[in-house]
Amino acid sequence: MRDVLEVLEFPRVRALLAERAKTPLGRELALALAPLPREEAEKRHELTGEALSYPYALPEAGTLREAYGRALAGARLSGPELLKAAKALEEAMALKEELLPLKNALSQVAEGIGDHTPFLERVRKALDEEGAVKDEASPRLAQIRRELRPLRQQILDRLYALMDRHREAFQDRFVTLRRERYCVPVRAGMAQKVPGILLDESESGATLFIEPFSVVKLNNRLQALRLKEEEEVNRILRDLSERLAKDEGVPKTLEALGLLDLVQAQAALARDLGLSRPAFGERYELYRAFHPLIPDAVRNSFALDEKNRILLISGPNMGGKTALLKTLGLAVLMAQSGLFVAAEKALLAWPDRVYADIGDEQSLQENLSTFAGHLRRLREMLEEATSHSLVLIDELGSGTDPEEGAALSQAILEALLERGVKGMVTTHLSPLKAFAQGREGIQNASMRFDLEALRPTYELVLGVPGRSYALAIARRLALPEEVLKRAEALLPEGGRLEALLERLEAERLALEAERERLRRELSQVERLRKALAEREARFEEERAERLKALEEEVRAELLKVEAELKALKEKARTEGKRDALRELMALRERYAKKAPPPPPPPGLAPGVLVEVPSLGKRGRVVELRGEEVLVQVGPLKMSLKPQEVKPLPEAEPGKPLLAKPRREVKEVDLRGLTVAEALLEVDQALEEARALGLSTLRLLHGKGTGALRQAIREALRRDKRVESFADAPPGEGGHGVTVVALRP
């Protein structure tokens, strides 16, 4: 069987990972990535998570590995090569010091980086910043170079003095090297004035490069010292190369750097593709999973557990069934290889083996047919798969007679279920869909198809078998009705199954629309509840402020009364009791009076329809409570200030708006909408018609395949706002229009 990694396109995942590696070591590890033991894979997941939260810089490990390999082979490295290797080791040790304090999985990997201090110290002493060997590299080299410098200067002084004495004989006043010996440029016709050895001449022949006899011995001595210098430099470089080769910590350092690069590449892949860390358990449960190799892939959620071990997926061709199989297979392989997986959340079992029969794997050498190739792979599954295995089978039962293929496929599914195997299977065979419906251990599923647009949506629908849509598409494309009816008659069982599936689909869409309506209502109630809570909080705050102000007012009034009483007592004492009593009675009457109740706000009365601008909602006045108005908004009652509500113009004060409903007809055009969109429009139209007091609603849905009409009627049948519904008269739209009578 073709390697499952190839079948599931895992090498393409490796390639994406290798693109994100920064060193040859990391790229090689990425391209060789394969499933690991569980403990090691989980450690890689931990490392990837830490690399996502803690980015770090990597040294140039490729240069280090190349230099180390050459040194091991006995080569003498150049100064720059040794310097680059030393720099990489120094950066590796710095990275180790950076990661060790983290005390996590990354720090454990960093512990593998060795201590290369002896080699680094020797390199720093021997080489300068350009990689040239320094004088201090050895006493002998220092001595040789001490002799070289004055000798070189002595040669230059003699040659410049010679040129100054015979200026006419020289082309230019400069000293140059030819054959590693110092010489001067002499005009071709003046050679007799400069006795010496001809070393070279210019291309034009106008200049001769002559080594004067006066510096021959000095040049000879200089050449001898240079040979000694070169010999000592080579010895020093050879010594450094041997020190690098003998550093036993280098291989472990390279291994640690390679893994740190791979982990960083895995983190980059997870960040770029939106992957998440998987958890492991006894079942497969993926939430919003997607194919990591398909741009903008549709996300789907599904589960494989003891109740539903096998998912049987059906539906139209090119609808995404095979991609879904690969989505699960790649998620498992990526998780077992230490990668994050393509899902928002993933719980995965750890299969002992993944079996995949996907695509045409016909063997030309063995001359096997497509069907025989499938059987060969299926036989391996039946013989070897265990309850801990994962099987992925594409187009089970294809490539042979449909009846025999269906019978054989059912037997294979029964055998796999008996073994307790978990997996995904795709098929076009209707008998297999019927077999899976209600069968323990296996669940029907399908890939959704948009009949209006005639294209797949790639969305997985659990619990519902898929349809071929051949007849539905033919009807949508206006094939003659008599041909379609004859086709349905020729396939009675298939026709009944398709009709059943069509009804199930319509019911499912109606239920989805109902659920969406309830969700919107619940969301609206929650918004109202929140707004009411905020209003109550503001009210309590204002009430507390008013109480405080009232207390201060009462306190001030009491002080005033006390002052007046004191004055009256004084007056009674000095002027007589009768006048004081008269003033006391007047004071008592003043404080005994009650303020008249405030008049009701204009335009507001029980039953009046009002708008609450702060909520964007309408409600009805229930009661006037002094300075507040009790308003019914949907299922909630709330106390509001008069300025917080606005009477609607058409409302008559004191009378409910619906006391005299207008018997108008509202018409809604649903043609061209999807089923879900149409059902939302119908729900909104029913709500508006009820608020406006309409008695009738006309829904224009067209005839088409009938799926939209059936879905709408399923929703109307469940709606408590609807009294009845029927087709419009033949002259007013007939089957293409549904007339709805609303409850009063």
Swiss-Prot record:
Alphabetically ordered keywords of this record: ATP-binding, DNA-binding, Endonuclease, Hydrolase, Nuclease, Nucleotide-binding, RNA-binding, rRNA-binding
Which SUPFAM superfamilies does this entry report, sorted A to Z? DNA repair protein MutS, domain III, P-loop containing nucleoside triphosphate hydrolases, SMR domain-like
Consequence of gene loss (knockout): Disruption causes an increase in the frequency of recombination between perfectly matched sequences.
Q: Which GO terms describe its molecular function?
A: ATP binding; ATP hydrolysis activity; ATP-dependent DNA damage sensor activity; endonuclease activity; mismatched DNA binding; ribosomal large subunit binding; rRNA binding
Q: Does the keyword Nuclease apply?
A: yes
Q: Which Enzyme Commission number(s) are on file for it?
A: 3.1.12.-, 3.6.4.-
Please give the annotated consequence of changing H701A.
140-fold decrease in endonuclease activity
Presence of keyword Endoplasmic reticulum: no
Biological processes annotated in GO: mismatch repair; negative regulation of DNA recombination; rescue of stalled ribosome
Where do the annotations place ATP binding? G315, P316, N317, M318, G319, G320, K321, T322
Entry-linked Pfam families = MSSS, MutS_V, Smr
The Smr domain, residue ranges: 668-743
Q: What modulates its activity? A: Nuclease activity is stimulated by interaction with MutL. ATPase activity is stimulated by dsDNA.
Its annotated function is as follows: Endonuclease that is involved in the suppression of homologous recombination and may thus have a key role in the control of bacterial genetic diversity. Cleaves the phosphate backbone of oligodeoxynucleotides non-sequence-specifically at the 3' side of the phosphates. Preferably incises the branched DNA structures, especially the D-loop structure over the Holliday junction. Has ATPase activity. Binds to dsDNA but not to ssDNA. Acts as a ribosome collision sensor, splitting the ribosome into its 2 subunits. Detects stalled/collided 70S ribosomes which it binds and splits by an ATP-hydrolysis driven conformational change. Acts upstream of the ribosome quality control system (RQC), a ribosome-associated complex that mediates the extraction of incompletely synthesized nascent chains from stalled ribosomes and their subsequent degradation. Probably generates substrates for RQC.
Q: What is the annotated quaternary arrangement, including any partners? A: Homodimer. Interacts with MutL. Binds to stalled ribosomes, contacting rRNA.
Q: What is known of its domains?
A: Contains an N-terminal DNA-binding domain, followed by a dimerization domain and a C-terminal domain, called the small MutS-related (Smr) domain, which is absent from MutS and contains the endonuclease activity. The Smr domain can also bind DNA.
Family in the record? Belongs to the DNA mismatch repair MutS family. MutS2 subfamily.
Q: What name appears for this protein in its UniProt entry?
A: Endonuclease MutS2
Q: Which organism is it from?
A: Thermus thermophilus (strain ATCC 27634 / DSM 579 / HB8)
